[in-house]
Each structure stands twice: as C-alpha cells, then as structure tokens.
Amino acid sequence: MASRVNIVQVQILDNPAMFVDKFKLEITFEVFEHLPHDLEWELVYVGSGTSRDFDQVLDSALVGPIPEGRHKFVFDADHPDISKIPVDDIVGVSVLLLRCKYNDQEFINMGWFVANEYTEEELKENPPSQPLIEKLSRKVETEDLRITTFPIRWTDEDPVAEPVEDEANRVFAEDDLMPLNDDGQEDDDEEEEDDDEMEANAEEVDLNESFNERLANALDGAEQKGADEKMEDDGANEDVDMADDEPGVQINTDTKVPESMAEPLSDKTNNEMVQ
C-alpha cells in the first residue's frame, strides 16, 4: 500500500559543528491522510561499521496526532556518548540515521556519512592515541543521502504487504553480469590477467567504496525486513517554502499529546515544545 507520509526535506542545521555540539535537524514532511496515532522519530549514531552493538539512540520524539497537510519541526539531540564508541572509530567516518515509525512499524530510514576530524593541522598530522574530543569537528555529508523504505500497515484493514522487487532498481550480482560464451580457455586467460592486475594494484584503496560499504552495513543492520532500497529525489532535494500560517502538530519526547493541544511547529525545537 502507498505510504501516507512523505519526507519532503531534512536540513542539517549548524553544519559543520564541533563534535560535542547538539545535532539539529529541520524536518519537513507531508501527510496525505489524517493519522490518529503518533509518528515516532529516532536519531541514531552508528558508533562502528562492524557491529550494531555500538549504535546509540541519541533521542526520540513523538509527533501527533497529525492532520492532513505539510508540517515542519526542528529535532535536536545530544552528541553521542564517547565512552560507548570504540577508540579507533571516534576519528574518521561514521553514520547518522534518522528513522521514523508508525504504530511501532519503521517505514523509512535515512542515512548520512559523518566526518569527524581535528580542527588543528598538527593534530591531523599527528593524532593522539587517545582522541581529544574537544578538538574534534563534525560534518554531516548532506550531499550523500541514502534512503531505505519499508511497506507497513497504516490501518488495521491494510493487508500485510510482501516486498516486490523492482527490476528497474535491482542490483545484480557480479555473476549475473558475466557474458555467456563457449570460449572457456579465453575466459581463463582473461581471468588470470585480471588477477595479475588486481595484485599489481592491491595497495590502492577506493575510499568512496569503503565508505559506501560502511553505510550499507549500517542501513542493512538497522532492520532485516527484506525491503527494497530506493531514493526519493523529491524528498531529499526539493526546496520547500513554508507558510507562516500552516497547521502544526504537537511534539513530545515522553508522552503523547492530544490533537486539540497541537501548536504550530515553525521555529521551535522538540525540547521547546514539551510542556
């Protein structure tokens, strides 16, 4: 079934910033039908690309009930707990995830690379064995956004949807792309030449490929639902002009708030809206 929520834009505010500064995300989204229950937003910092044990939920917020229309709010969260991150993964590239759920069902997962590096050249060239957190800067790479969507049941009447593979977006395995021919000997010779070239270039590392693999591991480990990955260009890149008089919804990080108490969201953070 079609999603009832479209993420129009997520803007990372105060970016770049120092590592110890708060994360601030301005989120604009559309609701196509009235949602009687809350949307649950969750910001996660991936402490290591090798294990989900180091993932940290920085903060979460409940937004709702939500009337039909376009809405905007600012979601802020504290920086990650440095003691829960492996020392070797503090400086370098990590991942920031924004998840959204409805009725405890995750329907979208957005991910960005995060580059953590020292601000002083001397520390960049000779990094200390124990990272100096107060000297670290943080930059969320907003130009490289990854989005994973999942089909969910928006109402009790909705059937349980089975993920359907889109041939246009299918990622083929390398074996699927091999040409079919009967020249077995020529294939063997070509494979040997390829192996020689790979050995000659073994010391060359494609950092982009390494970073992409790290983010892919983080996104794949977040939810094992077998859903397809696709990009929503209109959600990631569209510039949004928000009217000052648009209707808003109530945000609460602890408890749900009735629709009658909803307030406009413009220019407010999630913490400021909690009564």
Swiss-Prot record:
GO MF annotation, one: histone binding
One cellular-component annotation, GO: nucleus
Ranges of biased composition (kind: Basic and acidic residues): 265-275
Stored InterPro entries: ASF1-like, ASF1-like_sf, Hist_deposition_Asf1
SUPFAM superfamilies: ASF1-like (SSF101546)
General function of this protein: Histone chaperone that facilitates histone deposition and histone exchange and removal during nucleosome assembly and disassembly.
Family note: Belongs to the ASF1 family.
The protein's name in its UniProt record: Probable histone chaperone asf-1
Organism: Caenorhabditis elegans
